[in-house]
């Protein structure tokens, strides 16, 4: 069994880690931290886990956690993980960080988040479908939810060098805003409504650019997110405008289908679907469903991806990374369908 610690276990991503790990065949959660809730039962916050967990929140030091754990997940606010990660690593634990602290180069992180990085370390970007090196990593920076859905949506087209410009329109459930209500996520402001926020220059854009530029370095990228009155899920619509030399190519549906099936041949959690993916089919699962439609006599192909923002967009992907880092089957503890309808 793998002894596991969770730093910051009281929020949505911490709770989702606990839900998934509670039925993982090789996971043994031994420590869940929360300074504010230290001493209280974990199930006092995550009541859906009653009968499955018998743990209390703790407030140990990083060294104490590392000495008890093989793997530690840091599910804390941006700018906080960097105060934990070095000591966890130095004391022998492997770390998957669910904040933004280790996703980007230091200079890009500081510019994007306005935070001085106090503890840079080399990390692997934790999108396993594009980064097989996750398997040998000691520190993984788990991707943001929007970059996961956006990058997976068009990676095959980028790898083929086809993309001139892409406009991402993402619609996310309220849980993406975290457990504390904000003006954007407060139910009376969102019920029967859709809210657009951070219309330009969203802080996830650098992650999307970073990953797509590894595949094709001249893509122009625009991204705008919306919050919808749903709890879970992200539906990303990618309007891909191809280079002039590929305008005839994208009219060939069989070619595009093969491009995607070849690219994702070994990606166990990517499902290619006919037509438009549905959030209900991936809800509470680690799958990313991808479909596309070709605009006739045009330079545009529309690619749609659907993920659960808390699972493939956060905690599930973190466990997928853990599986690879620890030499387990990638699907361990994650091979189950979505919760449709």
From Swiss-Prot:
<comment type="function">
    <text>Catalyzes the NADPH-dependent reduction of N-acetyl-5-glutamyl phosphate to yield N-acetyl-L-glutamate 5-semialdehyde.</text>
</comment>
<comment type="similarity">
    <text>Belongs to the NAGSA dehydrogenase family. Type 1 subfamily.</text>
</comment>
<dbReference type="InterPro" id="IPR036291">
    <property type="entry name" value="NAD(P)-bd_dom_sf"/>
</dbReference>
<dbReference type="GO" id="GO:0070401">
    <property type="term" value="F:NADP+ binding"/>
</dbReference>
<keyword id="KW-0560">Oxidoreductase</keyword>
<dbReference type="Pfam" id="PF01118">
    <property type="entry name" value="Semialdhyde_dh"/>
</dbReference>
<dbReference type="GO" id="GO:0006526">
    <property type="term" value="P:L-arginine biosynthetic process"/>
</dbReference>
<dbReference type="InterPro" id="IPR050085">
    <property type="entry name" value="NAGSA_dehydrogenase"/>
</dbReference>
<dbReference type="GO" id="GO:0003942">
    <property type="term" value="F:N-acetyl-gamma-glutamyl-phosphate reductase activity"/>
</dbReference>
<dbReference type="InterPro" id="IPR000706">
    <property type="entry name" value="AGPR_type-1"/>
</dbReference>
<comment type="pathway">
    <text>Amino-acid biosynthesis; L-arginine biosynthesis; N(2)-acetyl-L-ornithine from L-glutamate: step 3/4.</text>
</comment>
<dbReference type="GO" id="GO:0051287">
    <property type="term" value="F:NAD binding"/>
</dbReference>
<keyword id="KW-0055">Arginine biosynthesis</keyword>
<feature type="active site">
    <location>
        <position position="145"/>
    </location>
</feature>
<keyword id="KW-0521">NADP</keyword>
<dbReference type="GO" id="GO:0005737">
    <property type="term" value="C:cytoplasm"/>
</dbReference>
<keyword id="KW-0028">Amino-acid biosynthesis</keyword>
<dbReference type="InterPro" id="IPR023013">
    <property type="entry name" value="AGPR_AS"/>
</dbReference>
<dbReference type="Pfam" id="PF22698">
    <property type="entry name" value="Semialdhyde_dhC_1"/>
</dbReference>
<keyword id="KW-0963">Cytoplasm</keyword>
<protein>
    <recommendedName>
        <fullName>N-acetyl-gamma-glutamyl-phosphate reductase</fullName>
        <ecNumber>1.2.1.38</ecNumber>
    </recommendedName>
</protein>
<dbReference type="InterPro" id="IPR000534">
    <property type="entry name" value="Semialdehyde_DH_NAD-bd"/>
</dbReference>
């Amino acid at each position: 069994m793998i002894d596991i610690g969770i730093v910051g276990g009281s929020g949505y991503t911490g709770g989702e880690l606990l839900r998934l790990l509670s039925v993982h065949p090789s996971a043994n959660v031994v420590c869940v931290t929360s300074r504010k809730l230290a001493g209280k039962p974990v199930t006092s916050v995550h009541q859906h886990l009653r009968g499955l967990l018998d743990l209390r929140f703790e407030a140990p030091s990083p060294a104490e956690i590392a000495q008890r754990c093989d793997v530690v997940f840091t599910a804390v606010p941006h700018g906080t993980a960097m105060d934990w990660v070095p000591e966890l690593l130095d004391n022998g634990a492997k770390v998957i960080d669910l904040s933004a602290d280790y996703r980007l180069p230091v200079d890009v992180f500081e510019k994007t988040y306005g935070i001085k990085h106090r503890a840079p370390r080399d990390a692997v970007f934790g999108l396993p479908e594009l980064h097989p090196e996750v398997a040998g990593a000691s520190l993984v920076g788990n991707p943001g939810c929007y970059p996961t859905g956006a990058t997976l949506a068009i990676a095959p087209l980028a790898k083929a060098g086809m993309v001139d410009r892409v406009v991402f329109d993402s619609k996310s459930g309220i849980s993406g805003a975290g457990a504390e209500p904000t003006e954007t996520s407060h139910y009376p402001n969102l019920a029967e409504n859709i809210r657009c926020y951070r219309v330009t220059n969203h802080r996830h854009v650098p992650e999307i650019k970073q990953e797509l530029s590894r595949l094709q370095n001249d893509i122009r990228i625009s991204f705008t997110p919306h919050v919808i009155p749903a709890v879970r899920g992200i539906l990303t619509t990618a309007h891909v405008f191809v280079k002039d030399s590929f305008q005839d190519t994208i009219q060939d549906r069989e070619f595009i289908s093969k491009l995607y099936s070849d690219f994702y041949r070994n990606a166990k959690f990517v499902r290619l679907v006919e037509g438009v993916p549905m959030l209900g089919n991936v809800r509470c699962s680690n799958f990313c469903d991808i479909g596309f439609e070709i605009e006739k006599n045009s330079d545009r192909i529309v690619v749609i991806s659907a993920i659960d923002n808390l699972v493939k967009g956060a905690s599930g992907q973190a466990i997928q990374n853990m599986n690879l880092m620890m030499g387990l089957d990638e699907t361990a503890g994650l091979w189950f369908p979505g919760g449709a309808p």
